[in-house]
Amino acid sequence: MFQQPGDDGVEVEERTIHGIPVTAVEIKTEDGAETLDRAVGKYITIQTGLLSSETLNLKALGECVSEVLTEVLSRYKGSTLCVCGLGNRELVADSLGPDVIRNLSLKVFSGVASLNGLFKSVCSFVPGTAWTNNLDTELMVKGILKEANANCLLLIDSLVTRNPERLCQSIQVSTAGGMNPFFAGRSIDWSSLGVPVISIGVPLAITADTFIQSGVLTDESFTTLHAHHAVAASSFIISYAILRTCWPDLTTQDCIDFIRFNRDVIPYPDRNFDEDDTGDNAVPDETT
């Protein structure tokens, strides 16, 4: 379904990508922004269903998110992209940003001349939180963007929602800068950075007032275990999508293997492992 912008300056498009329902709401005018109480820009919701690596087709979701990211990032082709993972890695529901960055050892790709990329250069970082490092996140982001000569910022963050039905059940992309962060104190004036800000996140928390007023949530609606599964699934999906977007030549299996390698790296001594190496020093096919 496609809805032309009306007098309110809002355009809505609904489609299906790799079998996944996707809704895009584009606010084109200040009147539309005032009506919806949001900044001018495009807001894309990918309806994943309950995020869990046990029940979802993560490859299809990864391809879907990759197509969405490619659409919003392709205008910056040939420039330098900086990927920022906001959040506290020690707090499960706020660890999405750092968890995605953990999956992306981007230095590997900078040395592969034969690998065509969408961007001239891609870098990533985790600024941490003011709660843990007592540093202003906005200043850190500005400094890194300046030193990296970045032309665009891709922001990854855990989100908060007032709608219980969206909790851990969608991936959201916005071209209007940061969305509702997990901690209200982390809100940043992204327009002051001087570069376009594309944000991607997952609603992993619900506001306390909504929790109290709705009366529809049970103890099973949002538990630590639930958040853990949601973060694991969504970080894989987003990491996969970033790799496929930045380096379209990578195959599906390339991306999966790369993410898996970064998560399952084991320390090893300074020696070569032969294919038939056995015994205590052998490298396992998988970690358990």
Task: Label the predicted regions.
Residues 31-75:
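An N-terminal, well-structured beta->alpha segment
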Residues 125-126, 139, 155-280, 284-287:
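A structural signal for small-residue-enriched, beta-sheet-centric alpha/beta enzyme cores
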